[in-house]
């Protein structure tokens, strides 16, 4: 996140501890937590772009040692009040590690629906790589944009509404499995595994990518 989009997001006012995007956010969170629970030897987790801390809090309730990082002061304030059993840090996400984390390293980095908002998505991936222990995992979620979904949007006349140019701080990067794979492999991640959520096959709402630092 650089100076162009960090200032917009810092001004975003979180007022509730509820999951972003309502039922969709809750369902996606449940899927993410379920995937993490299937991984062995995961104890410490960092949630990059935690927003109001909803996902961070769900993981903390299940006994994980979780730290949430977000650029929004109001998001961190809501998170600290709602989920006192987790740690929260107010910091911009970029290639430089948050000073508040010191030399801390984690078993897993989680980032849910964040990377599509960033002008420089490689910053998030670099930050995640540096925060992970060797052999640790990065779990990313982002809206899915494959060929057939993009074609369906075009044929149904929904391109303008879907790619909303009037939403300041909205989605500015649109990933397919191929482009996300290229980004992650370029920064040292291997063993990529994709799963999908929402709607029907090839028109999925979100994709979830689990990768490993080698």
Predicted regions and their residues:
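A structural motif corresponding to the C-terminal end of an alpha-helix
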Residues: 187-189
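Residue-level signal for the nucleotide or nucleotide-sugar donor/cofactor binding architecture
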Residues: 116-119, 175
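A short glycine-rich, Lys/Arg-flanked "PGG" loop and its adjoining helix->strand segment in the class I
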Residues: 125-134
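Short N-terminal helix/helix-N-cap motif within the alpha/beta-hydrolase-1
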Residues: 74, 119-123, 150
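Conserved N-terminal segment of class I S-adenosyl-L-methionine
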Residues: 1-104, 108, 125, 140, ...
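A short beta-strand submotif of the Rossmann-like class I SAM-dependent methyltransferase core
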Residues: 108-114
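Conserved class I S-adenosyl-L-methionine
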Residues: 140-161
């Amino acid at each position: 996140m650089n100076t162009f989009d960090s200032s917009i997001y810092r001004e975003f006012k979180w007022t509730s501890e509820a999951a972003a995007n309502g039922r969709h956010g809750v369902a996606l969170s449940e899927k993410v937590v379920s995937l993490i629970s299937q991984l062995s030897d995961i104890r410490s987790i960092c949630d990059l772009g935690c927003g109001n801390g909803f996902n961070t809090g769900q993981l903390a309730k299940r006994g994980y040692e979780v730290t949430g990082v977000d650029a929004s002061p109001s998001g961190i304030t809501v998170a600290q009040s709602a989920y006192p059993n987790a740690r929260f840090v107010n910091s911009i996400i970029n290639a430089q590690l948050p000073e508040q984390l010191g030399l801390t390293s984690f078993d897993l980095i989680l980032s849910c629906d964040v990377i599509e908002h960033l002008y420089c998505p490689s910053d998030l991936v670099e930050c995640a790589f540096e925060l992970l222990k060797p052999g640790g995992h990065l779990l990313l979620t982002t809206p899915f944009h494959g060929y057939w979904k993009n074609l369906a949007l075009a044929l149904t006349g929904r391109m303008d509404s879907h790619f909303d140019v009037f939403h300041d701080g909205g989605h500015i990067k649109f990933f397919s499995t191929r482009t996300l794979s290229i980004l992650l492999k370029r920064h040292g991640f291997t063993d990529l595994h994709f799963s999908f959520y929402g709607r029907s096959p090839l028109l999925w709402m979100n994709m979830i990518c689990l990768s490993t630092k080698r």
